[in-house]
Amino acid sequence: MSKDSVAKSKPHLPIMGVGPVYVISIILLSILAMIADKTHLHLPRPTSAPLEIFLFIVGLLFILSGLLIYFLAIKAKITSSIKENTLVTHGIYAVVRNPIYSAWLFICTGTLFLYGNPYLALMLFLIFWLSLTILMKHTEEKWLTKLYGEAYLEYCKKVNRCLPWFNKNNSPI
């Protein structure tokens, strides 16, 4: 029996994974941080028009990047691949292992830049990245390693977990 048919005969991963927990958490944290900053924290903000325009552009680029990543992930038809126990390593999955989660990280960070507070945006970006890293290491990465073994571990060596980047080893996946 081939490795593919063995994987297909195993129960598949949950379709949604831990995604809803992560996405809802970072959306709520973004909203709460903006409310807290407006009402209590009063973190310093840029006062020059060029810097405000720059932050707006950065925020817009983050949001557009997030939307593009999300669209490319949906286009990859990940749901059917999960049901078939197929490890997806092409398309957007060749540049980031968790594109849907990454898309939300970019969208929320972009929203914080549009809000106009670079300190809040950078601080929460790091929190979003760290929480995604911890969450993935302790959940989906364990599930995927158990399901795909060495193939998944090799994929992990070549492709970043959270932030889209070119293949680490410059080799085909």
Pin down the residues of each PLM region.
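Short, amphipathic, aromatic/basic-enriched membrane-interface segments that mark the entry/exit
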Residues: V88-P99
